[in-house]
Amino acid sequence: MASAACCSSAYVAATSFGNFKGYRRVGASLDRKVSDMSVNAPKGLFPPEPDIYSGPKLRVAIIGSGLAGMSTAVELLDQGHQVDIYESRQFIGGKVASFVDKHGNHIEMGLHVFFGCYSNLFRLMKKVGADGNLLVKDHTHTFVNKGGDIGELDFRFPVGAPIHGIRAFLATNQLKPYDKARNALALALSPVVRAIVDPNGALQDIRNLDHVSFSDWFFSKGGTRTSIERVWDPVAYAPGFIDCDNISARCMLTIFALFATKTEASLLRMLKGSPDVYLSGPIKKYIIDRGGRFHLRWGCRQILYDKTDSGDAFVTGLAMSKATEKKIVKADVYVAACDVPGIKKLIPAQWREWDMFDNLFKLVGVPVITVQLRYNGWVSELQDIERSRQLRQAVGLDNLLYTPDADFSCFSDLALASPEDYYKEGQGSLIQAVLTPGDPYMPLPNDEIVKRVQKQVLDLFPSSQGLEILWSSVVKIGQSLYREAPGKDPFRPDQETPVKNFFLAGSYTKQDYIDSMEGATLSGRRAAAYICGAGEELLSLRKKLAADEAHDLSEASNSLSLV
């Protein structure tokens, strides 16, 4: 694998399409991005910094080491609590995990793109010293159509939001004039306009549209089916893994509201390299440096609980296992930072008497397949066939790429976009594509999936005919993000539960952004805030449990003495 020094000169030659003369290149400063988001921002999307905690220090056990679990841990450690994280797999990261196979290839669980509105995640990355690990892409959303035809939503403009967005939609070559006009009408009649002057009010209006699909809402405002198929379906698939006919209007309009009010919300970033090295790694180090501990390959088999005389439930421990080892983990606070299928397996059946837990079973995950294809040339180099065949210099489209003409809605050449771990000397493109929805592909063998994806890549980039695949990988996830269908938002649970010392975290839980890396990070902040807010009550419960345990031991000792 090429070192950073070796490959740095190779990937700067990535081709840029549709440059707007005189546009200002946006800087990569996360300081600016976070401060920009905190000004006139809905508090549900970017909470204020927490007060310094002065309550009792608590022992916290977290199940799950994804972004939600690690975000919770960072917040709690900063407030002086003791944190242990338990992960059933041999690596951390959850949905943003990656690992290295025996041949040195970095395998990812999905394609991870950082929208400019991921301000809670940027805040976390800055806190742990990972803010330099993001590469800013050109401020344009690129659509690759069949035959190599490139369309764009180009946000590069001297004037910021909302003007830059209006220009992007009016100037796009992805739609015909009639569809652009109808698209503009629909957006003009949306809560997005209110967001410019009243972000919190607009967010409430958007929440109230959860019951309707984005397509139905869009058509009711004059939008066209062509706009859905050529622009909005690929965009919806990227964050939500389902199309506009099946995704809630709340999800799409939440994103649009941020794009309309924050100049850089639509700006895309990608990691320098693999998530394990450049995202999870720095967070893990921060946690360990502050006394937090990771326990890998320890899975939770059962939540142990009891009830008070008044009927209030509380957790007494976690039954954990690692291969043939078993133990009971005890803490003052327990946090389940799982995905949807994970939390369903974990919750005791008796807890479904509470609507909050029963509603979890109304949520389902979306199957997703991530495919990586390594080529012996540069797939997305459309302007010069000879350059696409040489291996001295990386060339092509360096950005997230959308397409309406393939079963993968979004993809990227990671050898260009994330070169530190994915550029290899003497090799070419590493196309990473996300098949969504993955249902039709789940039963297929990996070789057949690779064959079908390769055919679709060639349809999008005819100039890549003749390039060979050197290596491939396929990762299937039966249930990834929860299916954000119309009417599902009320079933998302809060982070605080009816069980006094048991809390939830996860991107599927209640928070005002969508199920995403940003949503996971925000859920962790919310879970930690609830825990700190209940500090005194949790201390009282700890003392009661200790007294009960001492009493039980005394009773047992007296019984033995009598015998």
Curated annotation (Swiss-Prot):
GO cellular component entries: chloroplast; chromoplast
Cofactor field: NAD(+); NADP(+); FAD
UniProt pathway annotation: Carotenoid biosynthesis; lycopene biosynthesis
Enzyme type, top EC level: oxidoreductase
The UniProt record lists the keyword Transit peptide: yes
Keywords: Carotenoid biosynthesis, Chloroplast, Chromoplast, FAD, Flavoprotein, NAD, Oxidoreductase, Plastid, Transit peptide
Tissue specificity comment: Expressed in roots, leaves, flower buds and lips.
EC identifiers of the protein: 1.3.5.6
A Pfam family of this chain: Amino_oxidase
Domain of life, source organism: Eukaryota
Principal subcellular localisation of the protein: plastid
Residue stretch of the organelle transit peptide: 1-35
Entry keyword annotation includes NAD: yes
Reaction it catalyzes: 9,9'-di-cis-zeta-carotene + 2 a quinone = 7,7',9,9'-tetra-cis-lycopene + 2 a quinol
Gene Ontology terms, MF aspect: 9,9'-di-cis-zeta-carotene desaturase activity
Function of the protein: Catalyzes the conversion of zeta-carotene to lycopene via the intermediary of neurosporene. It carries out two consecutive desaturations (introduction of double bonds) at positions C-7 and C-7'.
The family this protein is said to belong to: Belongs to the zeta carotene desaturase family.
PANTHER family, per the entry: PROTOPORPHYRINOGEN OXIDASE, ZETA-CAROTENE DESATURASE, CHLOROPLASTIC_CHROMOPLASTIC
NCBIfam families: zeta_caro_desat
Name used for this protein in its record: Zeta-carotene desaturase, chloroplastic/chromoplastic
Organism of origin: Oncidium hybrid cultivar
Lineage: Eukaryota, Viridiplantae, Streptophyta, Embryophyta, Tracheophyta
